[in-house]
């Protein structure tokens, strides 16, 4: 059985669209109808004509698609496609911060659960966090769950950022160290460094550019050779878009287990059996939708 052919057949039969994140396996990227970062995927999810959305990404992304498309069927091909960082932030963390800073707006990275988003004033992605926080009429902002992105936002906006929880992080980006920076410069002396803002502050400081994955794609045209400090599959995406340029992963072991849970086989099974359906309780979805839509409005 040719899985790709079967997926294309079922996709047509179900009137489905496949949305994939930049960190997906190469073969999954190759069959997707749209590939993007969290912000691009959220925007694309507001313009879906299909009846079924198959989300090749982790659970919080599929939840966001469902929140923005309550009347459509949203499928996630694997229950293992979870985000460890999103699960670090509990509602209690937000409520505790609100007790200490009652007037501070709650800004949540989209890498959070739907339940947490219901308590947010606005959501952000790594692509628009600085822009959105700058526009907020407050010098103190509660921000979660990524402490490294919180550091970057504080540096770029000059505002007091309260990270919730205090140690929230992405285990993939947390791996990158100053040793990786030194090694990258030795191995590729002509390359510049593109670094994701989920990396630790010491690594961020060595960047030629700090950008979300969408930002990396936009700015890759500025130089001919890059070392990429983010999930390794981003290198495949960049090489495909810019075949004339050179891209190197800063670490081969920088891979997200949750993202890799999505395969051609389970995308096929997902379309065949219409599983696993993503559901978000109406009250949570209604509140979270406000925060997501406010983000989309503030970052046009």
UniProtKB/Swiss-Prot annotation:
Cross-referenced SUPFAM superfamilies: NadA-like
Record-listed iminosuccinate binding positions: 21, 38, 109-111, 126, 196-198, 213
Superkingdom, natural source: Archaea
Reaction equation(s) it catalyzes: iminosuccinate + dihydroxyacetone phosphate = quinolinate + phosphate + 2 H2O + H(+)
Keyword Iron-sulfur tagged: yes
Enzyme class, first EC level, given as a word: transferase
Cellular localization per UniProt: Cytoplasm
UniProt family annotation: Belongs to the quinolinate synthase family. Type 2 subfamily.
Alphabetical list of NCBIfam families matching this protein: nadA, PRK09375.1-2
Name listed for the protein in its UniProt record: Quinolinate synthase
């Amino acid at each position: 059985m040719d899985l790709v052919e079967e997926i294309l057949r079922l996709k047509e039969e179900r009137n489905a669209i496949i949305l994939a994140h930049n960190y997906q396996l190469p073969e999954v990227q190759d069959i997707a109808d749209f590939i993007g970062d969290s912000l691009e995927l959220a925007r694309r999810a507001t313009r879906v004509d299909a009846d079924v959305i198959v989300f090749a990404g982790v659970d919080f992304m599929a939840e966001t698609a469902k929140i923005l498309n309550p009347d459509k069927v949203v499928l996630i091909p694997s229950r293992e496609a979870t985000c460890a960082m999103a699960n670090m932030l509990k509602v209690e963390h937000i409520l505790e911060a609100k007790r200490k800073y009652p007037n501070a707006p709650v800004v949540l990275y989209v890498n959070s659960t739907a339940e947490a988003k219901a308590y947010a004033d606005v959501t952000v992605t790594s692509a628009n966090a600085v822009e959105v926080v700058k526009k907020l009429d407050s010098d103190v902002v509660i921000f979660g769950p990524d402490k490294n992105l919180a550091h970057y936002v504080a540096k770029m906006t000059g505002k007091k950022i309260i990270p919730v929880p205090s140690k929230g992080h992405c285990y993939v980006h947390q791996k990158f160290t100053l040793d990786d920076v030194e090694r990258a410069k030795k191995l590729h002396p002509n390359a510049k460094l593109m670094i994701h803002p989920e990396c630790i502050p010491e690594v961020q400081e060595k960047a030629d550019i700090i950008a979300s994955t969408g930002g990396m794609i936009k700015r890759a045209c500025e130089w001919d050779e890059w070392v990429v400090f983010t999930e390794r599959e981003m290198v495949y995406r960049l090489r495909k878009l810019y075949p004339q340029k050179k891209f190197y992963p800063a670490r081969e072991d920088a891979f997200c287990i949750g993202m890799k849970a999505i395969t051609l086989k389970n995308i096929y099974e997902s379309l065949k059996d219409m599983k696993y359906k993503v559901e978000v309780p109406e009250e949570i979805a209604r509140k979270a939708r406000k925060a997501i839509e406010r983000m989309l409005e503030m970052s046009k």
